[in-house]
Amino acid sequence: MTKHARFFLLPSFILISAALIAGCNDKGEEKAHVGEPQVTVHIVKTAPLEVKTELPGRTNAYRIAEVRPQVSGIVLNRNFTEGSDVQAGQSLYQIDPATYQANYDSAKGELAKSEAAAAIAHLTVKRYVPLVGTKYISQQEYDQAIADARQADAAVIAAKATVESARINLAYTKVTAPISGRIGKSTVTEGALVTNGQTTELATVQQLDPIYVDVTQSSNDFMRLKQSVEQGNLHKENATSNVELVMENGQTYPLKGTLQFSDVTVDESTGSITLRAVFPNPQHTLLPGMFVRARIDEGVQPDAILIPQQGVSRTPRGDATVLIVNDKSQVEARPVVASQAIGDKWLISEGLKSGDQVIVSGLQKARPGEQVKATTDTPADTASK
C-alpha cells in the first residue's frame, strides 16, 4: 500500500468511528427516555361546589296519638274502618253510657235540691233583716241564718261540679279521635270490657302529612361542617337547609323538605347525633318506619377541590394520600384529607392546591422520587380555569 493511500484511509476511519459513537449515544438517550414510566395526571382546579351530605334515616309520623278509654264499660260500637283516615273529634268507639247517664241525671237532681235549699236560706235572711234587734229575732239567730245561706250557696257550687263531672264522664263514653290522621288496627271489638287507665291502647292515630325523617350523623362530621360555616369555608344563604329524599326503591321523592333541628346530645354508644327533617306528604307516599337516605344541603364551598377517586389511596392507618408530579417531572407522595365522596370523586379539604398534578392512572408504575412522563386527563384549557 502506498503512502498516499494510508493518508486517505486514516481520516475515513476517524469519521466512521465518530459516527458510530454518536449513534450509540443517541440510542442510549432514546432508551433513557423510553424507560420513564408514563402516567396520567389530573390537574387540580378549584370551583364552587354545593356540598350535600347523604345520611341514612327512617320516617316517623308527625304526630302520634294512642286512643285509650277514659271511663270503664262495655264497647257497644266501633265507628271507623281500620286503616282509614279520621278527623279530630270523630267518634271511634261507643262505650255503654247507661250508668253514666244515670249518674248525670242524679247529679242534676242533687243540684236542683241544693238550689232550692239555697233559695230558702236567702229568703230567711231577708225576713230576718227588719226583725234584728227586736224581741223576735236575736243577733245570734240572724248570724246563723247568714251562715246557713252561705253553706247553701257552697252546696250549690259542689252540686254543679258533680253535674259537670257526670257530664264529662258521660261524654267520655263516646271515644273520639284526638288528632286527624290515619288510624291503625283496633285492639278491641264490640262487647269487650275496657277500663279507665288501661295500658293497652284501643287504636293508634298517626298524622302523616307532613312527616318527619330522622337521620343520624357522626358528631365529628357535624362539628366539621359547623366549623366550616363559622370560618367562612362554607357559605349558607339562610339558616334553613333543604333536604332531598331517596326512598327504599332508589327513587327520589318528588317533594323537598327542610331541616328542622339537630339533637342537643350525642349518643354515647354510637357517637352520633340525630337530625330531623320535615317533608310534605299529601299523597301519604311516605309511611312511618321506611328506610330512606336524606341529602342535606350544607351550603356552597367557593374553592372546592374534587379529584377522581382512583387517585386517592389509603395507608394501613387509613390516612388518605395521593401521588403528584412536581415541576421536575418527579413523583411525590402527599397526604391529603378526603372529607367526602361525591359521585366518583373525592372532595379534598386539605393537602392540594390549584395546579397540582395528581396521578390517576399508572400508579403501579410510579415511585416517589422517580421521573415520569405525564399526560393530562383533561384538556389544558379546562384544567387552567
Swiss-Prot record:
Residues 1-23 form the signal peptide. The keyword Transport applies. Residues 373-385 have a biased composition (Polar residues). GO terms for cellular component: efflux pump complex; periplasmic side of plasma membrane; plasma membrane. It comes from the Bacteria. Induction: Induced by LeuO, part of the acrEF operon. Keywords: Cell inner membrane, Cell membrane, Lipoprotein, Membrane, Palmitate, Signal, Transport. Residues 366-385 are annotated as: Disordered. It is found in: Cell inner membrane. Its main location: membrane. GO terms for biological process: response to antibiotic; response to xenobiotic stimulus; xenobiotic detoxification by transmembrane export across the cell outer membrane. A lipid is attached at C24 (N-palmitoyl cysteine). GO terms for molecular function: transmembrane transporter activity. It is a lipid-anchor. A lipid is attached at C24 (S-diacylglycerol cysteine). The keyword Magnesium does not apply. Part of the tripartite efflux system AcrEF-TolC, which is composed of an inner membrane transporter, AcrF, a periplasmic membrane fusion protein, AcrE, and an outer membrane component, TolC. The complex forms a large protein conduit and can translocate molecules across both the inner and outer membranes. NCBIfam families: RND_mfp. Part of the tripartite efflux system AcrEF-TolC. Involved in the efflux of indole and organic solvents. This is Multidrug export protein AcrE.
